[in-house]
Swiss-Prot record:
Signal peptide: none annotated. GO terms for molecular function: L-cysteine desulfhydrase activity. It comes from the Bacteria. It comes from Shewanella baltica (strain OS223). GO terms for biological process: L-cysteine catabolic process to pyruvate. Belongs to the UPF0597 family. PANTHER family: UPF0597 PROTEIN YHAM. InterPro entries: Ser_deHydtase-like_asu, UPF0597. This is UPF0597 protein Sbal223_1296.
Length: 424
């Protein structure tokens, strides 16, 4: 196997992984669980300091197993019930009694949450205390990337900040393009990528859960009611939108099921998976073709998102759905050129969508971008594409660079304004 392909597989395995609950509050739960383990005893007070972006994405989303919202319950639950060895599934096992103890700690004023100024987009510092004992755990650059651990003021672990690598730079130094991703997905031995089929299983279960039970805004269930009433049809477009949104409904509503995430986002893992799976079912392709399409979708999304920070004012579901649309063209028997058309079309359609925090309405944004993915892949199959208009260049690689430039240079102040509005 080509060394370049092994790099691609390593990247996918590093950032396409199960995550239980929205990853920003889960980062705080994980840090708190590690701090508790370091302390050696359940703390009687917890202080949490986070970056603005992590704060933004934790304000309105339910923490799995708790039925509650926010960083305070995430940190308290992590300290009381979290498994420090479980990463993003830190809260996979939690009892009602433990939730009650976590809430009691909050009610007693023993859990504080503060925003802190930092250049890092993903930053969380948890200080857990018990009597005169104190444990500090700092996460920096990635949701489970521990940068420092201290016990009673003494350093027990630290990472040189110059060596720490944030998730946003994961493709740095790697020879990767949309074309190389497309060829890799087509040609790599099936056995090497079979693991990606777990994404279909995990995110499919979330979708089923969102359709079966009332979570969040019930976007998926609302569409199902519309189909049953004869208002809308159950075609591929509506089925993709319905089932993708349902998975997001469940995730944002605190369902106790993991999502297969993509670069730290469960919703984007869902958006990279479910439309591709349903398209594969529509075209009755083999399991191998599905795996190749999922690899194309997930790695394509990772590559595009590596051009800008991991958390920003930009809703990443847009570019994730662009990568999914590329994979959908592949499943339909389209060409590489048409796959590029699909990416261009989705980005042209939905690139104005902002991120105003993780919450129930994220399911609506997931449905919007997934709908764009379907329209765009159908247009691409007819060789209709946006080219040389607005931020869309004539070349897909240039378009991707334009997106990165727009977010890095043009949306920083937007992010600050959104956070100020949400915090007012």
């Amino acid at each position: 196997m080509k060394p370049q392909w092994q790099q691609y597989i390593n990247i996918i395995k590093q950032v396409v992984k199960p995550a239980l609950g929205c990853t920003e509050p889960i980062a705080a739960a994980y840090a708190a669980a590690v701090a508790r383990a370091l302390l050696g005893v359940e703390p009687d007070s917890i202080a949490v300091q986070v970056s603005d972006n992590l704060y933004k994405n934790s304000m309105g989303v339910f923490v799995p197993g708790t039925g509650k919202i926010g960083l305070a319950i995430a940190a308290a639950a992590g300290a009381i019930a979290g498994n420090p060895d479980a990463g993003l599934e830190v809260l996979a096992v939690i009892t009602p009694e433990q939730v009650a103890r976590a809430q009691a700690l909050i009610d007693a004023g023993k859990v504080t949450v503060e925003r802190t100024e930092t250049a890092e987009f993903i930053y969380c510092c948890v200080i857990a205390k018990k009597g005169d004992r104190e444990a500090l755990v700092k996460i920096c650059g990635g949701h489970t990337l521990i940068a420092e651990k201290r016990l009673n003021g003494e350093s027990v672990f630290s990472v040189d900040s110059t060596q720490a690598k944030a998730t946003g730079s994961i493709c740095e130094g790697v020879d990767i393009t949309i074309e190389s991703i497309y060829r890799f997905a087509q040609e790599v031995p099936f056995e090497e990528i079979k693991f990606i089929l777990e994404a279909s299983e995990l995110n499919g279960k979330l979708s089923d859960e969102g359709m079966a039970n009332p979570y969040g805004l019930e976007v998926g269930r609302t569409m199902k009611s519309g189909i049953a009433a004869g208002i809308i049809g159950e075609d591929l477009l509506n089925k993709i939108v319905m089932l993708t949104a349902a998975a997001s409904d469940a995730r944002m509503g605190g369902a106790n099921l993991p999502a297969m995430s993509n670069l730290g986002s469960g919703n984007q893992g869902i958006a990279a998976t479910i439309p591709v799976v349903l398209t594969a079912q529509c075209y009755k392709v083999s399991e191998e073709q599905l795996a190749r399409a999922l690899i194309m979708s997930h790695l394509g999304a990772i590559y595009i998102k590596s051009h800008y920070p991991p958390l920003s004012a930009f809703c990443g579901n847009t570019v994730t759905s662009a990568a999914a649309s590329m994979a959908m063209v592949y499943l339909a028997g389209g060409s590489f050129e048409q796959s590029c058309f699909a990416i261009q079309n989705v980005i042209s359609d939905s690139s104005g969508m902002v991120c105003d925090g993780a919450k129930a309405s994220c399911a609506m944004k997931v449905s919007t971008s997934s709908s764009a993915a379907v329209r765009s892949f159908l247009m691409a199959l007819s060789s209709h594409n946006v080219s040389g208009q607005g931020i869309i260049a004539t070349d897909v690689e240039k378009t991707i660079k334009n997106i990165g430039k727009m977010i890095l240079n043009g949306m920083s102040s937007t992010d600050v304004t959104i956070i100020d509005i949400m915090s007012a």
